Amino acid sequence: MRYTVGMDDSSFEWDDEKNLENERKHGVTFYEAQHAFLDKNRVIAEDAAHSEHESRYFCFGSNKDSSGILTVRFTYRLNRIRIIGAGYWRKGKKIYEQSNPI
């Protein structure tokens, strides 16, 4: 499926079953995870550990109401951001805070 939150020329997609599994395990839907990409201070980093067949990345950014920092795993294909996983993880928050000092 394709979804969009207004990211320039990019749109989002994900596997619906993976989305449900992610929400059950981590309490975050992929729809919610899109908002991390709208954070002007977001941090994008390569996910070298999981980039065997295609490049994968992390996006560390604020959630919709700025109450937490999301870590979103994704890949990029033909102007589409395919979300693979998302959640609130301490390591992602630490990377975000180191890149955006107060």
Where are these regions (language model features)?
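Ribonuclease/tRNase effector modules and their secretory precursors
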Residues: 1-102
